[in-house]
Swiss-Prot record:
One Pfam family per UniProt: WD40
Chain's gene name: dcaf10
Record SMART domains: WD40
Biased composition (Gly residues): 63-75
Identification of the protein by name: DDB1- and CUL4-associated factor 10
Family: Belongs to the WD repeat DCAF10 family.
Length: 508
């Protein structure tokens, strides 16, 4: 003990007092709010008493023990700060315990090293035709391939082993595949039908669904209501009640209709439906209720409301999001009593370099956390293509104040290779939403929001920014039409016009 203590018989009591004070410091450190400035501990407050007015206070005497050096105070503060950080991590508070944040540097290195696997799947052009769509099962155990020549192929994506070929799965091109769960999946085709399949019994369809009058291009699934949702070039969005399907089909009804329909998607929480059109419009149904059919032909009452022009350049223009169409209840009083469910918003998304020219939204995807939408657009002259990311300005994590007039804001974009005209290129998000895989000529590009592959909410630009290229891989001999990330493995796949499917894995 130091000479400052009156006698040796008081040493145990002094030790107990110090231990109690240290325990109180630990409790206060563990209870502090995440992200706030850590308040000084009681001991530090006493040590720094009388010097609060100084920007860098020195430690004063404490209990007659004599003055300590300023470096001692700073060292104690550093130790306290380190202890507080460890304590917060231990009790799983703060951003330090998010696995995605902990491992994003590792994932960046992994995806930067992606290369075609030596045992990629090669398909015969004469037998299968072009690859139009790829889809993994939710558990990542099966990769399905939608082919031009009426067939669906199933592979083990880890070993590239062929599992099954669904010969004549349809009578025309197979356009899209969607898993309802780990065993049941649906396919759609230009033969205007949808087919349900069970992985446990692939010798025959579970059932065929008839209801569309033209090519069926898109399948979605509402996990809450177990409704299958399909869209086609007949302009119809149809819901199918899979709770009551039989060998003859299942009950269905027409939910929505619009002209020039290209793609339809549901947000991950199924609270919104997004529909893209070949005329450049993007339709958003908010507060979605799939059990209520919308009136066909009632959308002539929509009128355009263009936001005021801004003088802040492209940044402000991107915040406005372009023209917005809303229901004019003053001119149509019978619409005032409408339920707020399924409220419709019609947007003309801003496309870089295409302010005065039309465009076609050919591909549509949603961020896995519902924060943004991903569009592949082409000019009306079909001489330019872009990949664009639009942030949802409602329901997303808090961002700096933006214009409330539009629910989408262009945040990132990049120009694409203008090859394979007339074919739709399907792009996709990675499961964590940090990367985009985009068909690019005879290969694919991995794109990120910044050089660190950060999450969108962590690198939201004030002005519209270009997507960063993480890696380009050219492994096909023809135009790539589709790409897909595995939901469980560090792997993605791409398919091209000549019928080849390539698998990509990290190469060390």
């Amino acid at each position: 003990m130091s000479s400052g203590h009156p006698s040796d018989n008081e040493e145990p009591r002094a030790d107990l007092l110090r231990e109690e004070e240290e325990e109180e410091e630990e409790e206060e450190d563990s209870d502090e709010d995440r992200g706030s400035t850590r308040p000084a501990s009681p001991q530090a407050t006493r040590e720094c008493a009388g010097t609060q007015g100084s920007s860098r206070p020195e430690v004063t005497a404490d209990g007659g023990t004599g003055s300590a050096s300023g470096s001692g105070c700073r060292g104690s503060g550093a130790c306290d700060s380190l202890f507080s950080w460890i304590c917060r991590r231990k009790i799983r508070r703060g951003p330090y315990v998010d696995p995605a944040r902990d491992h994003f540097r590792t994932m960046t290195r992994l995806y930067s090293s992606m290369s075609p696997a030596a045992d990629s799947v090669n398909l015969s052009t004469q037998t299968h035709g072009a690859v139009f769509n790829l889809e993994y099962s939710p558990d990542g155990s099966v990769l399905t391939v939608a082919c031009e020549q009426t067939e669906v192929l199933l592979f083990d994506p880890v070993s590239s082993r062929h599992i099954k070929t669904l010969v004549e799965a349809h009578e025309d091109c197979v356009n899209n595949i969607r898993f309802l769960d780990n065993r049941l999946f649906a396919t759609c085709s230009d033969d205007t039908t949808i087919a349900l399949w069970d992985l446990r019994k692939l010798n025959s369809k579970v059932c065929s669904l008839h209801g569309h009058a033209s090519w069926v291009k898109n399948i979605e699934y509402d996990t809450h209501t177990r409704l299958l949702v399909t869209s086609g070039f007949d302009g119809n969005v149809i819901t199918w009640d899979t709770n009551r399907f039989t060998e003859d089909g299942c009950p269905h009804k027409k939910f929505f209709h619009t002209r020039y329909l290209m793609r339809m998607r549901l947000t991950p929480d199924c609270s919104k439906m997004l529909i893209s059109t070949s005329s450049g419009y993007l339709l958003i149904l908010h507060d979605l209720d799939l059990t209520q059919s919308l009136e066909v032909g009632s959308y002539r009452i929509l009128r355009a409301r263009r936001p005021p022009l801004s003088t802040e350049g492209s940044s402000a223009g991107s915040r406005s999001g372009g023209p917005r169409h809303t229901i004019d209840n003053k001119n149509h009083p019978h619409r005032e009593g409408l339920s707020p469910r399924n409220s419709l918003e019609v947007l003309t998304p801003e496309i870089p370099g295409e302010r005065d020219r039309g465009n076609c939204i050919t591909s549509l995807q949603l961020h896995p956390k519902g924060w943004a939408t991903l569009l592949r657009c082409s000019s009306n002259m079909d001489d330019q293509e872009w990949t664009c990311v639009y942030e949802f300005q409602e329901g997303a994590p808090p961002r700096p104040p933006v214009s409330p007039r539009c629910s989408l804001r262009l945040t990132h974009y990049i120009e694409e290779a203008n090859v394979g005209r007339g074919y739709i290129k399907e792009l996709c998000f990675s499961p964590d939403g940090r990367l985009i895989c985009s068909p690019y000529g005879y290969g694919v590009r991995l794109l990120a929001f910044d050089e660190n592959c950060a999450e969108l909410v962590d690198c939201m630009p004030v002005r519209t920014a270009q997507l960063r290229e993480v890696r380009s891989i050219y492994s096909h001999s023809d135009v790539v039409l589709t790409s897909k990330f595995s939901p469980t493995h560090c792997q993605f796949a791409s398919g091209c016009l000549s019928g080849r499917v390539a698998l990509y894995q990290p190469h060390f």
